[in-house]
Amino acid sequence: MAALLLAGLVPVLGGCVPLLVGGVAVGAAAAHDRRDYTTFIDDQQIDFVATAALDDEPGLKGRGRVSVTSYNYLVLLTGQVRSEAEVALAGGVVSRLPKVRKVVNEVTIGPDIDFARKSEDVLLTSRAKLALFKVEVPDFDPTRVTVVTENGVVYLLGLVSVAEGDAAVEQVRYVPGVVQVVKLFEYQEPKT
């Protein structure tokens, strides 16, 4: 009887493992972050809601690709659309969402980047994250910097000191293949 009961629970509890692992991953990421936990979760929600709003926008359907990255209520938009009006539309849709403090609209006009370029951007993001481990500023934690790469341009977001931000840019700008580094840091001096 106990074996039958246990066998019946396995499918039900099986769904708990991904939730538990996901929760641990979010908790670990939040533990290293300088944002408070509420802001960390709000940023994830903004990413989700903004992406859904852009996907649902009739003026953007099938007209390109826009990616969303939220950090401390600042939203970075990257990607490609077909016209200046669509760039403005994407920015307007996201700027009206609750909790969004500022939109940095880096969407460009043109065809979607191809698979090879997307793959190179993924590789550049990995190389940039790895380069951040070379930053030699006391108490700098490279996991506190969010790295987004679009068409060879690397965007750096995070709550950092001026020294940390400058050192991060200095490391990332020498990564082979990086076309440009854009600082979107918010500066705060470390607590003493």
Give the ranges of each region predicted by the language model:
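C-terminal motif of bacterial Sec signal peptides marking the signal peptidase cleavage site
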Residues: 2, 11-15
